[in-house]
Amino acid sequence: EANGENNQDGPDYNFSWNCGAEGPTRKKGVLDLRDRQMKNAFALVLLAQGTPCILAGDEFANSQKGNNNVYCQDNLTGWLDWRKLEREEELFAFVKGLIAIRKGYPVFCPEEELRGMDQTCCGVPDVADHGENAWQAPSEVSSRQLGVYYSGAVLEGEDCFVAYNMHWLKHTFALPALPKGKKWYQIASTEDGILKKAELLKNQRSVELDERTVMMLAGR
């Protein structure tokens, strides 16, 4: 409406959610959930295959006051407030950490598309989906959780596993067995942030994720 075009300057439907409050709020629960969802979104983008696309200011929670098309807003709505870098230091550090993970693990930025096949005859495909059972992706249409295993064999790097739980309930993910001598370590999550030192998982067969959480594991 602020653009003065009767909402004709973009699609009518927006894939968005205010987390329980419209606009600015002081409710800690809403603010914490918004922060978690921003981190989840960055994990989805930066750990996906292909070239990640990020709008300037996303890394420090620039909201444009809910306006997703600020082409005509030469004002505070469309400008970037760089002072938010200090206020959103935690989110900014998380995004930088995710970028470092993407660059540090070849499975997240291969030169060729992963095929879901065992290209090196190592016994596992280069990428595979998992759920509560290993090697079995959730089949329900309403499912909001998925585990993705990346084999490092093709690129001679470490195996990785990313568990996505977008549900409002906790879920358990089965972990694929690693080659002899290797263990799963947590390297980051949208709940704990980027870990300075990888933590060995006590349970090497499964991992439980809290609601609306993404966790990244490395096999080493």
PLM feature spans:
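Carbohydrate-interacting/catalytic domains
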Residues: 22-39, 44-220
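Alpha-amylase-like alpha-glycosidases and glucanotransferases acting on alpha-linked glucans and related
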Residues: 1-30
